[in-house]
Amino acid sequence: MKKLFVVLVVMPLIYGDNFPCSKLTNRTIGNQWNLIETFLLNYSSRLPPNSDVVLGDYFPTVQPWFNCIRNNSNDLYVTLENLKALYWDYATENITWNHRQRLNVVVNGYPYSITVTTTRNFNSAEGAIICICKGSPPTTTTESSLTCNWGSECRLNHKFPICPSNSEANCGNMLYGLQWFADEVVAYLHGASYRISFENQWSGTVTFGDMRATTLEVSGTLVDLWWFNPVYDVSYYRVNNKNGTTVVSNCTDQCASYVANVFTTQPGGFIPSDFSFNNWFLLTNSSTLVSGKLVTKQPLLVNCLWPVPSFEEAASTFCFEGAGFDQCNGAVLNNTVDVIRFNLNFTTNVQSGKGATVFSLNTTGGVTLEISCYTVSDSSFFSYGEIPFGVTDGPRYCYVHYNGTALKYLGTLPPSVKEIAISKWGHFYINGYNFFSTFPIDCISFNLTTGDSDVFWTIAYTSYTEALVQVENTAITKVTYCNSHVNNIKCSQITANLNNGFYPVSSSEVGLVNKSVVLLPSFYTHTIVNITIGLGMKRSGYGQPIASTLSNITLPMQDHNTDVYCIRSDQFSVYVHSTCKSALWDNIFKRNCTDVLDATAVIKTGTCPFSFDKLNNYLTFNKFCLSLSPVGANCKFDVAARTRTNEQVVRSLYVIYEEGDNIVGVPSDNSGVHDLSVLHLDSCTDYNIYGRTGVGIIRKTNRTLLSGLYYTSLSGDLLGFKNVSDGVIYSVTPCDVSAQAAVIDGTIVGAITSINSELLGLTHWTTTPNFYYYSIYNYTNDRTRGTAIDSNDVDCEPVITYSNIGVCKNGAFVFINVTHSDGDVQPISTGNVTIPTNFTISVQVEYIQVYTTPVSIDCSRYVCNGNPRCNKLLTQYVSACQTIEQALAMGARLENMEVDSMLFVSENALKLASVEAFNSSETLDPIYKEWPNIGGSWLEGLKYILPSHNSKRKYRSAIEDLLFDKVVTSGLGTVDEDYKRCTGGYDIADLVCAQYYNGIMVLPGVANADKMTMYTASLAGGITLGALGGGAVAIPFAVAVQARLNYVALQTDVLNKNQQILASAFNQAIGNITQSFGKVNDAIHXTSRGLATVAKALAKVQDVVXIQGQALSHLTVQLQNNFQAISSSISDIYNRLDELSADAQVDRLITGRLTALNAFVSQTLTRQAEVRASRQLAKDKVNECVRSQSQRFGFCGNGTHLFSLANAAPNGMIFFHTVLLPTAYETVTAWPGICASDGDRTFGLVVKDVQLTLFRNLDDKFYLTPRTMYQPRVATSSDFVQIEGCDVLFVNATVSDLPSIIPDYIDINQTVQDILENFRPNWTVPELTFDIFNATYLNLTGEIDDLEFRSEKLHNTTVELAILIDNINNTLVNLEWLNRIETYVKWPWYVWLLIGLVVIFCIPLLLFCCCSTGCCGCIGCLGSCCHSICSRRQFENYEPIEKVHVH
């Protein structure tokens, strides 16, 4: 049975009588004082056993507690300001259903605010709601609005019960509370706590709304329902739960200091996230970081934390091995102790006389070194040494002593000692700086002098762990352990708080793996090289150990010479033997080295591109010699003597070598005839294959390659090799590949990967056509795995998107489809106009890019290729990788939103946009069914542009098939089954795999081919909706196109045969264009080098598709660049050099590769900006050219626009503009207006429609005609507008004044003239040939001539193209002269004479006919003649047509 003790402190009254309530009760809670105790017990329940800690936070206090009683109006509220936290309670005394009232608590902030709304449903599981959202929250609410609709982008939207366990009996036993900080919000609700991390600004203003007192009285007073406890300052409570008893008490002495320095170790040895890290420093052996974030290995995993209130004046000993953890605060670990940290809590006052007199370090071998500091620079036995803790009153000079002799001067003690950390490897840190290094240390002891000080320490036995450390002013302020999947992402992104989004998963470190070696089988001979180093040690005049330069190096004898030794075998192994002799004051070294004179010989890298201790690690050479003389040497090793206090270089060992594969260093003798290859298949292995090193998975393939031993990618990575013994080809793939993790609210909810195996702790999975997706969402077995996910499978709203991929909060994966609309039925054209005399109908092609293929780059994978040491170096570049990855991600998200808003599909239009619907008249209105052969006989060529419904390629046209099937990509990693095939490893990886292995992941485009075809098909179908003024039903496509032809080119009395002439020309042009597409693409496919000289539209398509692949290929090739390092392979560098030297070389690779990545990102962002402008142009073309008819000449093709159709193309759309190109012109003299005079009055008349031109014909009469085509007619008064006078006023200005009048004025002629003048010396008139001209589509003849030499096949294709182009050009349409000009001409005399003769001749003939046939016959003849003369020809009426622009 736990015993509970509570000591509560009385807080001062905050508001007093000025508290803004109608009725105020300020009192201690009384018999409900246990609320605070219960709250603290719940709060501290996360503490491990044996914890004794002071909790400091904005906790609830005993006083003040207020009860606000309002009137019955629910639109009133109370406002409190400058709060840090708020707690409230529901009073249960004498409360019935009639007394229950709701409550709305609002905490205002920017951009996020908080609301907690409580209803009267106290027994409901969802009686209240908390919202943390962006927006302005209401101060009052209603029970029916228990939602978070007032805000957006909610961080928390959660309903909860008012009473724990949904029972009214449990009400009143729990406090509700809110705490808000700049980077976190903590909510305490129904016994549970919620911590939400995000950045926000809080005003400290809190409002209470909807609270009111009931009108019922209990014992003559109004009932107190809601009680509030505003908190303005930090409160401290001490919690001790040792020996199974939990005690909560008030902290009264040094509470703030205790909270700042003492914590309870969490299970696993972790330091609590809310610990302040007061006086904890970043340990470093080099420069000290002032401020910033970095991922590093630091001793931050606590095995035991010992809070020490004070020390006695006695010696204390602390050992790394066998330390007793009896006084630990919190969890205890049994890990190996790496560093013991002494954290000192002192005030700013001088603390002389309080500290340690000396630190004794018991090093390996039994030698004890002492560290102490003195107020004078010269130490002696008579001076007093100490290491004062806290602030010192003057400089202190520190030394290392052995047996009272100062061996080494360390430097000046910092003016304030806050932390001392000592590692078992012999490093002594003060305030994080490496003050001294020696041999490994077993134990530490020191004498303490604390006097009457009331200070306390903490002693932390720690181990090294990887963590993201935030440093401010050289001190640690926050630590995030890289101990979980989501924390690993935080570490890779160098941020403690992850925003919602996709993040590349950093490669996991490869631990101890088997070693695979592949060598050529041969007869091997082996040589053992034993090098003996004899060190000579003696003491200086002050007693310090000195290594003599007379130390000698002995090489094996070869050819009676011991100065040079060359390897003459196939293999060798090098071993070093070290001896140590000492002397007194002379140079006769006979004594054994003991105590501080004990030294060992080490061979350092020196100037060689490989380390001495890596020679036996399968390094290969053509020649290798060791020499004691520098003559002819390529490099040298430094031979040093390592003592307990320092290292001293005594000699040099020179190396003569040549790179190659004839000689190999091995760890042991393997002489004889055999294949020394050792392979570990189908598992992660550390390999050395024909001298190329790395880490990967080796798999056997079925591939057969006749030549080569090993095969590499453009980046230089090993992709496969051949075993020459049996000819088997093996593939080499990475142990792990990059993946994209979906993070929502700080939790990994899913991951995109090509590996079909569990990762990131995610067990549920599904597959897509492009990759595998693992998630927390439980995909049931009812789903047929291996089929593509459809967005309808999971009904949820995606929280994060990347390209066309979306992930919901529950981890479900959805594809983001285009927006669907109903498609309004609106007319698209109006009126009928006449046509020119002669013209050609032309179909012109234009390609516009709409979107790009998004690329995700795992920066650490690209730069380091999974090497753990390189990853540590990469963290020194702080946010370089984060900036690169976020730039690509944000660009992709921006494009996703823009393209998604652009593409929408009308289902009704989609059904009509097909060849089947085009050739059908079943849906025609009866008025149109009378027309014969309404379908393909008129515009049969449309079948190549309109989509065809089929099961495999729905909504794709014939031209789209050609474009998507025959456009050649250049090195672009496509998102298809290749990604899954890469990780199979049963074939040699291609470029796609090489990019994927190096962290380059090409994701599906925002709008893939199917979406684009649906969108363009919907555009085509939309033309058929109500094309002729809104009929009862939709009409086929052909009729809609006819309406547009009529609008531009036909009169109301045009003959049906002229429509057929137009349709025939169109059909011929489209048919030949379709064939040209196929032939041109065949030519491109045969030789992609000819892209620049083939048709313009196709060349642009080809360029758009290939440009990103070329950029990715170039980025991959950069991995082969060594950037002045000794190798482009990081594994090879670490295999050759010691860690310190290899770090310097790898740093060059990191800098170079980051530069390459930055260049790629800059190129990508620039390209996205260009595509953004291109996408806007495409939208304008769709609205003006496809959905309507353009009045702009040249915008929708070069001519008078008739109609346009759009087809999907790779990464964009291809437009087919049908235009009229005039071939004959009528020259007229235009008049701007008419000036008329009437006596003294003069006035002017100008044409009202600016599209009309007034001109005088040859008959001296005036006519009006449209400017776009010659259509003369007699003017009417409605065509003119009268103006007051005929005078024209001009503003006199100079050329220099024009910019002030017309800001965008540019004198084009003068500008061109200036350019020509500048380049006149080198400028000649170009020779332009006009013999080849194509007025209809494309001119490919001249370009094809440039391609003839490339291949005979391409030449044959050009012959066919020439024929097709001739057919295209033969689309000249000569229509009847339909323009009518009504004139009155006076006939000459000979015309009248001829008429008279005809009459005289015809009258006898007519009389003869009448007499011959009888009276009735004569009358009938006359009647028939009269009827024929008087009647007029009847033409079929056309309905009036209206024209609108559909936006």
Swiss-Prot record:
The ranges of region (S1) come to: 17-774, 29-774
List the ranges whose topology is Virion surface: 29-1388
Q: Where is this region: Heptad repeat 2 (HR2)?
A: 1303-1400
| Region (Fusion peptide) residue spans | 1020-1041
Cellular compartments per GO CC:
host cell endoplasmic reticulum-Golgi intermediate compartment membrane; membrane; viral envelope; virion membrane
What CDD domains does the database record attribute to this sequence? TGEV-like_Spike_SD1-2_S1-S2_S2
Q: Which superkingdom? A: Viruses
Keywords of the record, alphabetical order, are: Coiled coil, Glycoprotein, Host membrane, Host-virus interaction, Membrane, Signal, Transmembrane, Transmembrane helix, Viral attachment to host cell, Viral envelope protein, Virion, Virulence, Virus entry into host cell
**Segments forming a coiled coil:** 1102-1146, 1336-1378
Gene Ontology biological process:
endocytosis involved in viral entry into host cell; fusion of virus membrane with host endosome membrane; fusion of virus membrane with host plasma membrane; receptor-mediated virion attachment to host cell
Stretches for region Interaction with host ANPEP: 655-799
Q: What is its main location?
A: virion
**Where does the chain cross the membrane?**
1389-1408
Q: Which Gene3D superfamilies match?
A: 1.20.5.300, 2.60.40.3130
Quaternary structure, per UniProt, is:
Homotrimer. During virus morphogenesis, found in a complex with M and HE proteins. Interacts with host ANPEP.
Question: What is stated as this protein's family in its record?
Answer: Belongs to the alphacoronaviruses spike protein family.
Q: Please explain the role this protein plays, according to its UniProt record.
A: S1 region attaches the virion to the cell membrane by interacting with host ANPEP/aminopeptidase N, initiating the infection. Binding to the receptor probably induces conformational changes in the S glycoprotein unmasking the fusion peptide of S2 region and activating membranes fusion. S2 region belongs to the class I viral fusion protein. Under the current model, the protein has at least 3 conformational states: pre-fusion native state, pre-hairpin intermediate state, and post-fusion hairpin state.
Name of the protein described by the UniProt record = Spike glycoprotein
